[in-house]
From Swiss-Prot:
Induction note: Expressed in the intermediate phase of the viral replicative cycle.
Protein name listed in UniProt: Late transcription activator C
Reported cofactor(s): Mg(2+)
Subunit and partners: Homodimer.
Protein's job: Positive regulator of viral late genes transcription. Responsible for the transition from middle to late gene expression. Activates the Plys, PI, PP and Pmom late promoters thereby allowing the expression of viral endolysin and structural genes. Activates Pmom promoter by unwinding the DNA, thus realigning the promoter elements and recruiting the RNAP.
Recorded GO MF terms: DNA binding; metal ion binding
UniProt entry tagged with the keyword Aminoacyl-tRNA synthetase: no
The keyword ATP-binding appears for this protein: no
Record family assignment: Belongs to the c/mor transcriptional regulatory family.
GO CC aspect terms: host cell cytoplasm
Subcellular location: Host cytoplasm
Length: 140
């Protein structure tokens, strides 16, 4: 992953930096509805994280994304798979060996489902902290 995606295009960097000089309503009224919707989503997440100037940052992020992905067909999968992976990791972190029933009720899963999740997560967490000695790949 590049740290400065637009380092070779100073014009884009300059334009993204100039966004703050244009009144938001004027700017957003000229953008496609899908970009404004993306700004709303990004702004809400930035607010949730207590980031200052969330709307301004969200606009800059949306412009950066549209410069990078604009004009391409780009598939963003439904959040279900991502949310399930996050839920499974959280469940594993909450599991203490004695709270199976509590987790079963909280996540509305069966006991066998929870055991399967814990087994999968244990493997993932072990690999995260103890790299495979026989694997040719080096951890990143």
């Amino acid at each position: 992953m590049q740290h400065d995606l637009f380092e070779h295009d100073p014009a884009i960097r300059q334009l993204i930096g100039h966004i703050d000089n244009i009144p938001a309503p004027e700017l957003e009224s000229r953008w496609p509805r899908s970009v404004v919707d993306l700004i709303d989503v990004l702004e809400n997440e930035l607010k949730r994280q207590n980031v200052s100037n969330p709307r301004e940052l969200a606009r800059k992020q949306a412009v950066a994304l549209s410069c990078f992905l604009g004009g391409r067909q780009f598939y963003i999968p439904c959040g279900d798979t991502i949310l399930t992976a996050l839920r499974d990791d959280l469940l594993y972190c909450q599991f203490n060996g004695r709270n199976m029933e509590e987790l079963r009720r909280q996540y509305r899963l069966s006991q066998p489902q929870i055991y399967q999740i814990i087994a999968r997560q244990r493997k993932l967490h072990t690999r995260r902290h103890q790299p495979d000695l026989f694997s040719p790949e080096t951890p990143k």
